[in-house]
């Protein structure tokens, strides 16, 4: 397209990011929480995953038989974007000769001064999924204004070679200071180039290195400000404190599926800019007995609204995040090793931390919690609206969050002791008086007789898989019949007062 506008060019540049990289980490939270978030007009809705499905081209699969690219391509001096994908050519077969040196066309332009260095309009290059390439082609380093380079899915390039080529790219005076977007996912990269090279990439904004074998991260330094960073699915153990800085346009950062043992100290909770999300799921945080690897006074917190720490080894609630005034509204701590959240986990002995009040959504499923402290009362969390403590070890209903006037959804399904016995037996009397609560999931427990009168305000109720429950739903039967009350139940349960439920007697 001649004379592409900046908007058109940006839309093309971000297509790969939208298709392969973008995801909302809140998709890993419980259905109850996702439903609560999507019902709340004040919260950003959770988008469905838009990643490419398995029906699309897989790594190593070819879609054409291009084995040679004529040097005639260098005559296209106004070319703005050059995309090759799923092709069998090698790096030496790109514009290194004529298709037929004896052709009239080749003879006509044989003596023309053709050079990649003259292609000043060519800013975007993609060499995607070309399995026969063993190095980056030399022409890449001659382009005078390369801004985007997509070299994802080139697994024919060995670890040392792709590292050498990246370092060469950074050191080159033409490419290093100008590249803004670098897609390098699904390769064999094991380490980053040295800091002396990386610091030259001063305009780099987006870096994608997902699904590599990276173990060693060298820092860019804080002069390089990234707006998007994806390092998921690697083997990274440590992120240097001076790894990089971030712009005010960060939507999401991905560090999931690595070997991190501590929450990195590369952010700053005191920044006026709040990032969308930071994902640390599926790491080893907490495995050394602590969540950070520095004194509390030196931990800078995280300036993000959503922080995902699920599927780690956290045994102690990450108070460090709140004590450092991180502006967190949603936190996912599911699938960890916490047995309790003691007093002063969310607040100091006197008063409150500056930004803890912003917390609205907490996922604590799949831990071994037996109790909650008074930190979860409205005096500390006045805007708490969605909370799920299912798959824990509560023998008593934790009533602390129920005094929040904003609480809309609460889950406490499947509470078991170490032997797998059902241990939650008592109905939380008074729960129907919670001013904003519309959904309660208390299924898969051993709730016995319920004497409380149900109200239509709490209109989503899960009591299924409570084999000994006895409950009267007369007060909400008309709403059930009208389809205005969602009761999740078993037909074999002792539920009375509504023939519409077709209970087996």
Residue ranges and their predicted role:
Residues 50-54, 60, 82-84, 122-127, ...:
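Conserved hydrophobic beta-strand positions in leucine-rich repeat
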Residues 49, 66, 79, 122, ...:
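Conserved hydrophobic position(s) of the canonical leucine-rich repeat
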Residues 451-505:
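Leucine-rich solenoid repeat scaffolds
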Residues 34, 69-71, 92-96, 110-114, ...:
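The feature encodes a structural signal of leucine-rich repeats
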Residues 289, 344-345, 360-433, 438-441:
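Eukaryotic tandem repeat interaction scaffolds
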Residues 47, 64, 74-77, 117-120, ...:
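Inter-repeat linker/turn residues at the boundaries of leucine-rich repeats
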Residues 1, 11-68, 72-81, 85-107, ...:
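LRR N-terminal entry segment and analogous cap-like coil->beta motifs
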Residues 57, 64, 87, 130, ...:
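Consensus "Asn ladder" position of solenoid repeat domains
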